[in-house]
Amino acid sequence: MVDAEMAAFGAAAPFLRKSEKERLEAQTRPFDLKKDVFVPDDKEEFVKAKIVSREGGKVTAETENGKTVTVKEDQVMQQNPPKFDKIEDMAMLTFLHEPAVLYNLKERYASWMIYTYSGLFCVTVNPYKWLPVYNAEVVAAYRGKKRSEAPPHIFSISDNAYQYMLTDRENQSILITGESGAGKTVNTKRVIQYFAVIAAIGDRSKKDQTPGKGTLEDQIIQANPALEAFGNAKTVRNDNSSRFGKFIRIHFGATGKLASADIETYLLEKSRVIFQLKAERDYHIFYQILSNKKPELLDMLLITNNPYDYAFISQGETTVASIDDSEELMATDNAFDVLGFTSEEKNSMYKLTGAIMHFGNMKFKQKQREEQAEPDGTEEADKSAYLMGLNSADLLKGLCHPRVKVGNEYVTKGQNVQQVAYATGALAKAVYEKMFNWMVTRINATLETKQPRQYFIGVLDIAGFEIFDFNSFEQLCINFTNEKLQQFFNHHMFVLEQEEYKKEGIEWEFIDFGMDLQACIDLIEKPMGIMSILEEECMFPKATDMTFKAKLYDNHLGKSNNFQKPRNIKGKQEAHFSLIHYAGTVDYNILGWLQKNKDPLNETVVALYQKSSLKLLSNLFANYAGADAPVEKGKGKAKKGSSFQTVSALHRENLNKLMTNLRSTHPHFVRCIIPNETKSPGVIDNPLVMHQLRCNGVLEGIRICRKGFPNRILYGDFRQRYRILNPAAIPEGQFIDSRKGAEKLLSSLDIDHNQYKFGHTKVFFKAGLLGLLEEMRDERLSRIITRIQAQSRGVLSRMEYKKLLERRDSLLIIQWNIRAFMGVKNWPWMKLYFKIKPLLKSAETEKEMATMKEEFARIKEALEKSEARRKELEEKMVSLLQEKNDLQLQVQAEQDNLADAEERCDQLIKNKIQLEAKVKEMTERLEDEEEMNAELTAKKRKLEDECSELKRDIDDLELTLAKVEKEKHATENKVKNLTEEMAGLDEIIAKLTKEKKALQEAHQQALDDLQAEEDKVNTLTKAKVKLEQQVDDLEGSLEQEKKVRMDLERAKRKLEGDLKLTQESIMDLENDKQQLDERLKKKDFELNALNARIEDEQALGSQLQKKLKELQARIEELEEELEAERTARAKVEKLRSDLSRELEEISERLEEAGGATSVQIEMNKKREAEFQKMRRDLEEATLQHEATAAALRKKHADSVAELGEQIDNLQRVKQKLEKEKSEFKLELDDVTSNMEQIIKAKANLEKMCRTLEDQMNEHRSKAEETQRSVNDLTSQRAKLQTENGELSRQLDEKEALISQLTRGKLTYTQQLEDLKRQLEEEVKAKNALAHALQSARHDCDLLREQYEEETEAKAELQRVLSKANSEVAQWRTKYETDAIQRTEELEEAKKKLAQRLQDAEEAVEAVNAKCSSLEKTKHRLQNEIEDLMVDVERSNAAAAALDKKQRNFDKILAEWKQKYEESQSELESSQKEARSLSTELFKLKNAYEESLEHLETFKRENKNLQEEISDLTEQLGSSGKTIHELEKVRKQLEAEKLELQSALEEAEASLEHEEGKILRAQLEFNQIKAEIERKLAEKDEEMEQAKRNHLRVVDSLQTSLDAETRSRNEALRVKKKMEGDLNEMEIQLSHANRMAAEAQKQVKGLQSLLKDTQIQLDDAVRANDDLKENIAIVERRNNLLQAELEELRAVVEQTERSRKLAEQELIETSERVQLLHSQNTSLINQKKKMDADLSQLQTEVEEAVQECRNAEEKAKKAITDAAMMAEELKKEQDTSAHLERMKKNMEQTIKDLQHRLDEAEQIALKGGKKQLQKLEARVRELENELEAEQKRNAESVKGMRKSERRIKELTYQTEEDRKNLLRLQDLVDKLQLKVKAYKRQAEEAEEQANTNLSKFRKVQHELDEAEERADIAESQVNKLRAKSRDIGAKGLNEE
């Protein structure tokens, strides 16, 4: 196109195409095809360069900025010649590669040519400034132009789509895609502008404009400002970003006339309404309103012009430099006017917008001592409610106390502040979203015209791909949409294109461009994909975001390549998973996704919206159906289940519809590119642009355009259109197949035959060939038209010449005749001829003229008649045509309706079949449930009988228990006396022990003589012990190996996961390595220096490897030493356990000699067994730790080896080696410095572990013991309280009824309605509680199952423990004779035994005290229950009396009351069960959670200990201690051991002293507690007396009320007289009432049971006040009130006195209890501290012994020569002989002591021993019987409760099923009626259609006849006209 042709574009020409001069200058620049290349660059992707040299596959080049680089030869890419600079279609480039495309776009962008063709689609780059390329002049210039005839432009794409629509008769679509901020919205507006302008140009003559509205073209254009105001906002990338997607369809008629338009929107980002990031802002409309351009808006909306006054819209920026909000407001308002919005509609939209701003300012606070929220001021709520047409109080109530549907009923729910804030935001978002959707619907209604439409062009503008720092659910939906659109583009461009080639039989090799995105799409939308899992989680009530994350990981992590675990970086938002999209990897945060997907609303407020006086708001929510709303009837299929549709499901549905629309059209793609992130005009960020080009498939699209055949035409169309190029190839009149004709035609043309291919139905052309054929056709047509024009001009010239010749001949003849006439005109005979000739013909002429006149008149009349007839027929024909069209439309509509009715009928029939199947199934289930219900009813009756029997047994047992308690107290006193005697015997034993020591020293010399003889025996014994120990070790190691194997398997699975992560990291490192290799090759001149450094690092690496190997060898040596130490430790521990067992036997004998009771012996055994169990647990834990340490050492060795391999692999990288080296050094220093801290932490953790285990066992046992009794008592007390409250409420209601019955029938009716409403509410509450009970039972069953599993595991452990105990006993008996005991250990064991005996005695006393206190508590509670039952009976009697009075007034009211009481009793029973179950469930949950927490804590501590052990092992290996140092440590430890033993003895002595103090304090505490309980019982009696007094006061008040009612008439007469007296009395009475109320509140604080009575009294006083205000003042009433006042004063004084006494006693008692409690607490803390110190000392002693033994074993291993072994063996033999002699002496001593003890026992217990034994046996028998009976009773009660719960559940389920069955039956009946109605409608429609069809045929027949008659008449008229013209011509000729 030359410059003259470009002049048509006006000022836009320089921005579309450069001038010829500039193009010539660019083409003549210097260029060397061999040297000018592109080379890769780190920053700029590619740079231009010139080749300097080529050597060995490498190229050295100099870049434009003078930098010299060396790259591989395959990385060099050639530049295109200068004639291709700034080429308009990049598919025409000679060298097509990434840098060529990049630089072409960059150079065109630098010249502000932002549009460029890229094969079949267009690429546009955002200029970030205004360019004059969109005015009307440019639109006109592009109209009707082919793509090749004009520069690239969005108008060209639009015009081509328009022309394709007209020529191909196919719908078109223009897909404008790109990232956010790339310019999609602007290009969409230009496309719409183009279509509106060309339609206006083509139809300017037929414009009709509705008054008050614009034309259709103006309306289409003005829809954009309205949509942008409410749907666009500022984001980080874009100042005017569309936060919704839209698909605009512009409909055209068959001739291309603009017919109508409609808009579909997708996924409005409604979260922006209430939240924005710092660099962003809310939607434009908020700031437009606040711009103060229209002040009346601010007044109407009650707002200011400061955005920071409103929280919702001021979280980010409030102004945008590139947007003038005031001007935009006027544009928006004007757009509403053009679109035909009424002023009411506009104001309603503004009001809702203002209300949303006020919504954000509403504040709420938490009520004191409650979790519920309440309004913190109502000003903003008042404004919002006013603007929305609501009641402010109702709005606040709905927000703070919404009504929630539970089952079939509604209950009021309290909300906390956070919940109210969330609900407020959700409502604001919902209002805005629905208002936006309404606006779009309203615009569509305006754009909808009645004009016929044939085709449409759709323009898609949807949110671009988004990658933010914080990506949430909205970003996933947007990115998923872009993924689908990109897949559509790829499928259309690459897959469908190549499939078309194969389908048409063209030789083609399928090219895989690697652009398939289906994997990512399937990951999101397929079943078990992200969307599916999200919707599934939304259906579960207890699902959270974390469960959603866990499911995602379980289903996709490691299974899908597109799903990854994100790498969280400090300072950035947390991410939970990553998806690999086509545009990059996006990290998503899933917090709040479930709420966003469910999108719940406060249905109470929504109900207010539906009743709003603001018409728009009520319309927005008119069709809203909540999650629990029933399906509306008669709405058809579309409405069913719509209320349960999630946001993701709705988005997928809309997206699928969009994709279906796009697939049905011919798409045109426009790719928008964002040039930089800073919005700078003219700046290209090369890496950013290249990333977009690669992702968008631009290069691949160009390649397939060049390689493939983008243009194709059907053979018939091609033959018809291009036959003109060579007509001889296809002879006229001869039949030739279209394909053969096309082949002949193309073969005859002078074109490249490789540029086209023949398919089965089409001929395919390479890019550009079809344009060439079009040019040839245009040239051919030009030549043909030129020839036709020449021939036509020749014919016309010849015709003109012939006319000239004829005119000349005529003139000659006329001249000759005139000359002849002039010669004879004066001749006389000629004159005579002239006179006679006319006379001869005049008569004949006159006759002919008369005849002609008559004929003319007749023909004229006939003509007029025919003309009139013709007009009539034409009018009739027009009307008939109109009727015909109307009938056709009616027939079409009827056919559509009939088809819809048939579809609905089919669907209803299917639904009916399904419902019938469901009904049948439900009927069967109902029958089964009824059978089960009958069985359960029978079981229930049986259980009730058993329950009554058990209750009687319980009563008997309680009596027996009371007797046993008395005997138990007597026995306890005897036990105390025996304990004192035991203390005296202990002193005697101590003296005997000292004597024993003296004897041992005397026999020491004799024992030395026997040493030689026992050497052999000791040697054999050691060998035997060693072998047996090996057997034990092997068995233990076998079990340990099993455990280790399980641990290793778990570790293996964990390591496999770590291995995957490590492999990924290795891949990343390999990628980094490749990049580093490339950089090394580029930087060749640095290679020598790096090689030298690398060699140094390799040497360092080899040194490190050597060190690692040495450390590993040292670790192996230490492991061997550790193993030897373990065996030695096991031997010593075995010997120690044997000695302990021997000590236990001796202590048992001593205890029996001392006269200990059997109960004490059992307790001692139990304590000893627990001690042994704890010791074994400790040993097992130690072994496990050691095994874990070995596994960790192995793992550490493997990790060290892996690190060595990594060092070998990565030793070429200097920086990483130095970093790792420094890290290793730091870790080594940290381990060295923290070793002592780790050892201390290990000891503390072990101590904490044991303490926590003890506490857990104690808490669990206490919880199990007290749970049953506490639950029963609590439930009984709650039941009595609720019954008392119910009776009080009934009393109040009946008093109110008595006072209201005198007011008449209307008041009574109102009361009846109130009772009905209350009954309904109670039924609703009952149903709600039933649902809650059912869910609680389910949770309880789950927890019970878990508890049973824990119990089974505990039982299994106990069985293992018993088995181990039996084995221990066997070993003990086996080695009893060989055991050698040391004197010092016997002394220590004796002390410990005495200590344990004392502990056991104290524990027995504590347990007995606890039992006595519990019994007292039980008796006290039973007394309270009996008193309460008495009160209940009295209340019931009073209620019965009032009921009798009530029945006298009305029988109907009594019936309603009875029903209400029945429902109330059921409610109370269900509430009781719910409370008991909830408390049980809560305790079980707490216990289970605590056990889980302890377990997790132990696991973590175990893991930490394992890591510490591995670190210590490494430290031991690295430290390399020598044997000499270990020997020193052993000696030091032995010294420390002696010190610790002495300290331990002192601690034990102090502990005994402190425990004695604790025992005495506990006894004092029990006495004080008993005294307090006695005083509390006395206070309870006083409270009961006060309660009875108040009841009497209430009765007297009731009588006075009756008297006042009777005296009402008398009071009216003396009203004026007593007015003054009344005022005085009212003041006194109010003062007395206040005093009474204060006294009652104080009494209420002391006793909760008095609360109900005080409430009754307050109610009575208030009722009295109300009667005084309403009833006239009378003298008699004054007297009555005075009497009441005196009574009230007496009551107040009495209550005040009782209150003061109770308060004084309570204060004294509280002080004593607090003092004792503080003392007890301090003693308990001291005891705990002593226990902790003792356990710490024990652990330290054990650790010291263990370390000592380890050191000894290592020393033995280090000194392995035979001489030392012999010496050691001899010493051991000597020691063994010595100990054997000591054993014999000790046995003799023990016998003597036994004899003495027997004598002492006979002396001390001769008198009362037998009686004591009998009593103790009797006590044990009674206790066993009591325990058995209690267990049986508990089991039976538990079974009975379980059965009752099951019966109630089944009953409730049966009722629910019956209700559901009835509902389903009703639904089936209604559906059947609907089906019948639809059938009738279908039949009627069919009959009507047949009738209309017959009418249509009849009218068609008449129309045809009329047309025939009109044709006949017209032919006659034509004949008459012709005849008349002939007659007229003849007449003229004759004249």
Swiss-Prot record:
N6,N6,N6-trimethyllysine PTM positions: K129
Chain positions found as Phosphotyrosine: Y1308
SUPFAM superfamilies noted in UniProt: Myosin rod fragments, P-loop containing nucleoside triphosphate hydrolases
MF annotations from Gene Ontology: actin filament binding; ATP binding; calmodulin binding; microfilament motor activity
Residue segments, region Actin-binding: 655-677, 757-771
Coiled-coil stretches noted in the UniProt entry, renumbered to this chain: 839-1935
A GO cellular component entry from the record: sarcomere
Start and end residues of each IQ domain: 781-810
Superkingdom assignment: Eukaryota
Span of domain Myosin motor: 85-778
Main location: cytoplasm
Pfam family, one: Myosin_tail_1
Domain text: Limited proteolysis of myosin heavy chain produces 1 light meromyosin (LMM) and 1 heavy meromyosin (HMM). HMM can be further cleaved into 2 globular subfragments (S1) and 1 rod-shaped subfragment (S2).
Membership in a protein family: Belongs to the TRAFAC class myosin-kinesin ATPase superfamily. Myosin family.
Name of this protein: Myosin-7
